């Protein structure tokens, strides 16, 4: 059984590059795999491995400057969620492209999962999903507004174009684990919105703590590992990835004429050129050859 830990923490690292070697070495030594992002504004990522290995890595992160109160969310999987370990240096741990946004200064009001339903059912509350379009497509909260953004960078422009619709409304926001809402609520407060709320622990904590019979969640929640999606109780969902576009699809979508394993699906068939598809086919060939030799291929990670 693999323990999965999803974490983020906003702090201030003087030089993130100095932190990378020891963190990566520890993960490798402990058999932990996944991706961790380091930036001057903090750390973000998801890792998986044996219980003892995850505990060791979390203890190391909590000992980093300003990270003693690190929080994380856990789940389990009976198969490895990641193929390798990566520690990457970034400009932002979640990219919004707004230099003035600083969640350490202030964020919206945190709302516990058990109080979320009452808030979003209020007539004076507008509910906004801050995730990307392909994530929203497989599940969201009842009544939520989908900004239809392709990346989190698009959110500020969407807000600027639509903010008059929400005049005199309280704004409630949510995302997968909470990190995007740390920035989006700070951004809205900076734009003069007075009453801003966000779901503490994100969708994942809601699905873990709120029983399905009391839930206002509809569908599955996309996750950034080999589980692809989870439902109530964080039970692994039916979705899988199209490795041509990295979007979630259902098993029955593999029966569509547009589907070619590792190359295309009904969502991306018209988005790539024939040259792209030839490259994807060659990639799949190399993956198959590597597996036949009992090796991992980088494209599978």
From Swiss-Prot:
Enzyme class: oxidoreductase
Record flagged with keyword Oxidoreductase: yes
Protein's name in the database: tRNA uridine(34) hydroxylase
Matching Pfam families: Rhodanese, UPF0176_N
EC number(s) stated in the UniProt entry for this protein: 1.14.-.-
SUPFAM superfamilies found in the cross-reference section: Rhodanese/Cell cycle control phosphatase
Active site: residue positions: 175 (cysteine persulfide intermediate)
Domain Rhodanese span(s) in chain numbering: 121-215
KW tRNA processing (keyword) present: yes
Chain's role: Catalyzes oxygen-dependent 5-hydroxyuridine (ho5U) modification at position 34 in tRNAs.
Record family assignment: Belongs to the TrhO family.
SMART domains named in the record: RHOD
Catalytic activity reported: uridine(34) in tRNA + AH2 + O2 = 5-hydroxyuridine(34) in tRNA + A + H2O
The species this protein was found in: Ruegeria pomeroyi (strain ATCC 700808 / DSM 15171 / DSS-3)
GO biological process, alphabetically ordered: tRNA modification
Coiled-coil ranges (or none): none
Alphabetical keyword list: Oxidoreductase, tRNA processing
Gene3D superfamilies: 3.30.70.100, Rhodanese-like domain (3.40.250.10)
CDD domains: RHOD_YceA
One Gene Ontology term of the molecular function aspect: oxidoreductase activity, acting on paired donors, with incorporation or reduction of molecular oxygen
């Amino acid at each position: 059984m693999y323990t999965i830990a999803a974490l983020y923490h906003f702090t201030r690292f003087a030089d993130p590059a100095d932190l990378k070697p020891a963190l990566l070495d520890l993960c490798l030594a402990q058999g932990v795999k996944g991706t961790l992002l380091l930036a001057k504004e903090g750390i973000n990522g998801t890792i998986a491995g044996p219980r003892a290995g995850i505990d060791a890595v979390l203890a190391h992160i909590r000992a980093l400057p300003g990270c003693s109160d690190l929080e994380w969310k856990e789940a389990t999987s009976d198969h490895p969620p990641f193929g390798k370990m990566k520690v990457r240096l970034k400009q932002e741990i979640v990219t919004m492209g707004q230099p003035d946004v600083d969640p350490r200064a202030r964020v919206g009001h945190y709302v516990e999962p058990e109080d979320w339903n009452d808030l979003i059912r209020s007539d004076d509350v507008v509910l906004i999903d801050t995730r990307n379009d392909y994530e929203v497509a497989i599940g969201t909260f009842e009544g939520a507004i989908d900004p239809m953004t392709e990346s989190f960078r698009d959110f500020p422009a969407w807000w600027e174009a639509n903010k008059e619709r929400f005049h005199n409304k309280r704004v409630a926001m949510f995302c997968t684990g909470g990190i995007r809402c740390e920035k989006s609520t700070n951004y809205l407060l900076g734009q003069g919105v007075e009453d801003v709320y966000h779901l503490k622990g994100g969708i994942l904590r809601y699905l873990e703590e709120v029983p399905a019979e009391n839930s206002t969640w509809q569908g599955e929640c996309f996750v950034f590992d080999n589980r692809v999606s989870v439902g109530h109780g964080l039970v692994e969902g039916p979705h899988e990835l199209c490795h041509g576009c990295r979007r979630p699809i259902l098993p029955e979508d593999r029966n569509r004429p547009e589907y070619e394993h590792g190359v295309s699906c009904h969502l991306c068939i018209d988005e790539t050129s024939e040259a792209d598809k030839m490259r994807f086919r060659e990639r799949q060939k190399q993956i198959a050859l590597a597996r036949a030799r009992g090796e991992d291929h980088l494209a599978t990670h």
